[in-house]
């Protein structure tokens, strides 16, 4: 797929994908929720607040069931925003959840789908407003596009602005740590970067890169 940093490419992709089947089916890049459940749930529990929900952004959600699955399975109260640059993908997911309501584990949880260019998170989110940002293949798509590398850095900067001091950015990727860690560490100054192996699927090894704001050293 070419021009993965362009809205028009994704509108075309989701239009064509939805027209090939009579009933809607979620499209998962890499893998689904069950493969990364053990990475997400501990973070949700550790990010929980006594008086407010955990704010979660599924960035570049497409038509994935990841965001709705977080909403469905999280025992703590979450407000999950599934955001994508493609209005076609957003409309498909809105229609899907309208026809098949997703019931949350926590009755105070909320789920929404919004059209949003992730290079412009500041148009929707104030600084220090998100607890968890999930990026499943979105940065990969940008880095593999001819004109997308600069946008990938901008997305990263926007994420850092929106994250709370105790928040986390999770990037799920098939890019080898030798390459991704080098890029993240050079672009994510004042942040800690770690990696864990998710596992292999269809012969491809996937990784979870976690980026968190660095806590200032105490004197």
What are the functions of these language-model segments?
Residues 178-219:
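Class I S-adenosyl-L-methionine
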């Amino acid at each position: 797929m070419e021009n993965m940093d362009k809205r028009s490419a994704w509108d075309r992709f989701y239009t064509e994908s939805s027209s090939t089947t009579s009933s809607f089916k979620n499209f998962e890049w890499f893998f689904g929720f069950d493969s990364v459940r053990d990475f997400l749930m501990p973070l949700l529990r550790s990010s929980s607040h006594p008086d407010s929900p955990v704010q979660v952004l599924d960035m570049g959600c497409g038509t994935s069931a990841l965001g709705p699955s977080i909403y469905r399975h999280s025992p703590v109260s979450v407000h999950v925003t599934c955001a994508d640059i493609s209005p076609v993908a957003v409309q498909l997911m809105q229609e899907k959840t309208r026809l098949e309501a997703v019931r949350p584990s926590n009755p105070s949880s909320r789920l929404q789908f919004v059209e949003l260019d992730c290079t412009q998170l500041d148009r929707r989110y104030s600084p220090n407003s998100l607890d968890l940002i999930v990026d499943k293949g979105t940065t990969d798509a940008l880095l593999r596009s001819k004109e997308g590398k600069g946008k990938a850095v901008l997305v990263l900067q926007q994420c850092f602005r929106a994250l709370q001091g105790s928040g986390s950015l999770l990037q799920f990727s098939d890019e080898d740590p030798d390459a991704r860690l080098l890029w993240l560490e050079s672009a994510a100054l004042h942040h800690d970067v770690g990696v864990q192996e998710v596992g292999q699927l269809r012969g491809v090894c996937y990784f979870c890169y976690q980026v968190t704001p660095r806590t200032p050293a105490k004197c």
